[in-house]
Every structure is written in C-alpha cells, then in structure tokens.
Amino acid sequence: MPLMGRKIKVLVVDDSAFMRKVLKDIINSDPELEVCGEARDGIEAIEMVQKCRPDVVTLDVEMPRMNGLDALRVIMKRYPVPVIMISALTQEGADATIKALEYGAIDFIPKPSSSISINMKELKDEIIAKIKEAAKVPRRFLELRRIRLLRVQKAKKVKPSVPARIAVAIAASTGGPQSLLKIFPKFPEDLKAGILLVQHMPPGFTRSFAKRLDSVSKIDVKEAEEGDVVEEGKAYVAPGDYHMEVTLRAGKPVITLNKKPKIHGVRPAADPMMITAAQVFGRRTVGVVMTGMGRDGAQGIVEIKKKGGITIAQDEKTSIIFGMPKAAIETGMVDYVVPLEKIPETVVKAVEIIRGGGNLGRHVTISR
C-alpha cells in the first residue's frame, strides 16, 4: 500500500449522483484506493474534508450553492490536500479549470459531456493513475497560491515576422500549467528563438491555456495551427488530441499537426515534437523537460543532444511530479538540472550560446 501500509482515501465531490457513483466505482475498483466520503456541493465538500481527512479530493468545477473554485480556495487555505478537478468539456469549464490550477489544484480530469458512463470508464486508468500521483505530491505544493500574474500590455506596434533559426522545445504534464505560468512572464520579448510547447491537455483546454499564457507573457503565445511558421519571439502550444511536429518548407520551419497513435498514452506527446525539432533545427535546439508523470520527453532529449543541442531538466525539489524530468536525467543526456525559477534564464543563456556558436558540452549542474 502506498501510504504507510494503508489505502489512499479519496473524497468525491460532484452534484450529480450518477457521476459520484461512476467515480466511486472506478476508485473502489483499485485495491490501493478507497472512497472515504462524498459531497454534492462545495459547502458539503468543506465539511467532509474536515470529517474524513482524505488524501486526495476529486472536485467538480460546476456545482450549486458553492462551486468548485470557491470550495478549492477554502480547502487549500484551511485543510491543504491534493485536489483533482473534474471539469466539463466546455469553454467555461476549461477557463475555470485553468484558474483552479493557479489556485492550487494539482491536476484535472475532463468530464465528457455525452455518453458519460462509457467515456468515464475509458478514463478509468487515467483517473486511478492521477489519484495515486496526486497522493504523493509533497506538502510544500499544497497551499492556496493564486499565482500573482500581471496582465501584460503588449506593444501595439506590429513585430516583424522572422522565421526562427533556434527552437526551444518544452515538455510538461502534471503540474505544468502552474509552473509554466510562473516562468513564461520571464521570457524576453526579443527572444531570438521560437518556443514549441507540449502540455498534456485535452482539446479546448489547450486553447484556454494558450490564451492565459499569452495574457501574462511579453512574447506572443498561441495554440498551434497546421502550417504555422515558427517565428522568433513566439510560442506555439500543441492543441489537444493532436501531435505537433516541425518540418521544413521553402527553407522555413513549419508546424504540422497529426492524429497518429498516442505515444506514452497521450496525444499530444512531446517526443515527436522534440525529435522533429532536432531534425529541423539541429544543434540550434534547446530541449526542456518539466514536471509531469511518465517519461514523455526523454527520447526527445536524447535526439536533441545527439544533434548537438542544449538540454535542460527541472529539478526534483521544484517539480510537482518528478517523473518526466527524472526519466530525462536518467538518459545521461541532460546538460542542466535547474529549479523552476532558473529555467527562463538558463534557456536565454542557451539561446545566446547557440547564437554565438559556442557549445555547453557536458555541464550537469544540480541546483539545490
């Protein structure tokens, strides 16, 4: 058993009795998990958190009396516990979920809008895996932490479109949205590279997330579209349910999207993006693997290093989930292991080194 020889206790919060039953059946089907209680709205959720002291809470976003966001604020302030949001596949649901991640939720699971029981059963493995990972999250990440982000007033002048000669390829999963929102404001407007970002998210959520990132960043951020030219000072977020790759067309780096089979159980996956970026940009590629479960991005790091690029991984102390960075580091192909707050400056330095024609070589530095 994962927690001192006992089962992981889960509180299920949803206004739909049917949804609560579906989630309870899924959770109780795993020998390491048990539902310790249930609640129909945010007010009941706060009472039940105090009563059954769960290890993890699954929290519906939209509920009567008190919604999931308001309940989350109270729970994180009074009884810090890992929370996984259960979100409807709507624009409102996606926007609220991004806010919830900023407020301290660890992760989210999309709630399909039709044929709920069939779709949720398909999500069984994902739900169980996310609950188990959430239960392991260190307590230092559990607090009400509305990320203080200022909406950036971007220069109104139209920036010239310059095809990127350097690519920064970033992979992130669980804990990624919160972490990326902290570092993207630090990238300079005149970054002489294009950023390619794969954040594991379903359709709809990536668009909301790209808009949120754009609102706090000096660089332009958008959800990637088929045929986008990768340009300097711009970031492209892989859309949910599509792999994002890079190819050369008429001498320019161009984004292509496809629905090839899932890799590591996800689509988009970071590996195909990073591998094709390395093929197109060669030694002018910077690879970054951030917080997340699994090992997506590790193969991408290997291919970037083989081409002579520069590779970076987030350290364990600042990773909400250390799975992906750990897998990347274990390849032996990571140049820099740095805390979250040092990622932007390390990326900027790497871009400067590439522009100057230098090479970092094997400088593995683990920052405590």
UniProtKB/Swiss-Prot annotation:
Descriptive protein name: Protein-glutamate methylesterase/protein-glutamine glutaminase
Keywords associated with the record: Chemotaxis, Cytoplasm, Hydrolase, Phosphoprotein
Coiled-coil stretches: none
InterPro entries assigned to the protein according to its UniProt record, in alphabetical order: CheB-like (IPR008248), CheB_C (IPR035909), CheY-like_superfamily (IPR011006), Sig_transdc_resp-reg_Me-estase (IPR000673), Sig_transdc_resp-reg_receiver (IPR001789)
Organism from which the protein derives: Pyrococcus horikoshii (strain ATCC 700860 / DSM 12428 / JCM 9974 / NBRC 100139 / OT-3)
Catalytic activity: [protein]-L-glutamate 5-O-methyl ester + H2O = L-glutamyl-[protein] + methanol + H(+); L-glutaminyl-[protein] + H2O = L-glutamyl-[protein] + NH4(+)
CDD domains according to UniProt: CheB_Rec, REC_CheB-like
Residue ranges of domain Response regulatory in the record: 9-126
GO CC annotation terms, alphabetical: cytoplasm
Broad class of enzyme this protein falls into: hydrolase
NCBIfam families referenced in this protein's UniProt entry, alphabetically: PRK00742.1 (NF001965), PRK12555.1 (NF009206)
This protein's record includes keyword Transferase: no
